[in-house]
A protein has these predicted regions:
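Cysteine-centered iron-sulfur cluster-binding motifs in ferredoxin-type domains/subunits
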Residues: 1, 159-171
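FMN-binding flavodoxin-like domain, especially the glycine-rich phosphate-binding loop
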Residues: 1-158
Length: 171
């Protein structure tokens, strides 16, 4: 979903993997004039603790940030407010938030084929609205997002075990 959003900005994104424990992680360098698309998967209404831990190593430098919670057609619950809190605590200006519905990572029958053409159009529309907001010159005000504080308790597992047909898609 974040790739579709970035297409709307006509920019090639610099991506950093924060969710896979086996992936090496080097915090990206963020400048104050950058626009950061912070996209995370949602599992049981929360974002991955490893992603948050790694993200906290980034120096935000006051950069603008769009948060994208990608969920598998069930619910995103507290993910947006959790992402907002983490990003704000790090020094980002959270200027927009998107809850993006995608194919479920385990039960593929939910959200099958997503993102699709309609999702691509919607993300392009979001990109246009975000650009207008950035060019408008008005100060950014904190967003009021759905979710609970304190967040619901996180959970672990069950985790699927891949067989030799795994393509390392990351889901």
């Amino acid at each position: 979903m974040s790739e579709l959003l970035c297409q709307g900005f006509n920019q090639k994104p610099l991506t950093t993997e924060t969710c896979r424990p086996e992936a090496a992680y080097t915090p990206p360098v963020i400048e104050a004039e950058d626009l950061v698309i912070l996209s995370m998967p949602v599992y049981a209404g929360r974002v991955p603790a490893l992603a948050v831990e790694r993200l906290r190593k980034v120096e935000a430098n006051g950069a603008r940030c769009v948060i994208v919670a990608v969920y598998g057609n069930r619910a995103y619950e507290d993910a947006l407010v959790e992402m907002q809190d983490v990003a704000t605590d790090m020094g980002f200006q959270v200027i927009a938030a998107i809850a993006a519905n995608a194919e479920h990572s385990i039960c593929r029958m939910y959200g099958t084929g997503r993102p699709d053409e309609a999702d691509a159009k919607e993300m392009a529309s979001f990109a246009e609205a975000i650009l207008r907001k950035m060019q408008g010159g008005t100060p950014f005000v904190p967003l009021t997002l759905p979710g609970n504080r304190p967040y619901k308790q996180g959970c672990t597992g069950p985790f699927p075990v891949a067989d030799d047909q795994c393509t390392d898609c990351g889901t």
